Amino acid sequence: MKLIDADPIGINVCSTVATYANVHDELRKVYAKLPDAKKAGYKAGDFSYNTGKLRCPTCDGTGVISLDVQFLPDVEIPCPDCHGSRYNGDAGHIKRKTKSGELYSLPELMDMDVQQVLQACEDMKKIGSRLQILQDLGLGYLTLGEAGGRIIAKAIPEKIACDRGSITGKYLR
């Protein structure tokens, strides 16, 4: 028996729908193999929010800046440099051609919802199967880059989806 509660899905501030669904690692590997990434010397780890060379240095890959408002709770605003994408400008230059001929960078994919990414990554079976579970449970509207800590009420069906499809391979809390 597994307990599925309403806690946010995010383990840390860099957790997203893509990391929780375990597709971010796959996407990073795909983008690291592209000719432009190889030419620039990027590896899969460089596309990480946590430590990668391509993460935004201003917000440290969180996509937000916290403003200290005296006597009130801190206010989070989108990062003025990456505009919430979590990546620096160089990441936008590494683009992958889809089956339909469109070009997308990893930051652009992370800004898309599950339904859009399913179409853009239709030639990637592993990613498609993991995202299809979310889509089937009515979560196609979630963006891949949506912060995991902000998804609370939506987390229950996402946890079920991830458990059902063994997306994370871990027991849920």
Can you say where each PLM-predicted feature lies in the sequence?
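Conserved phosphate-binding elements of NTP-dependent enzyme cores
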Residues: 1-173
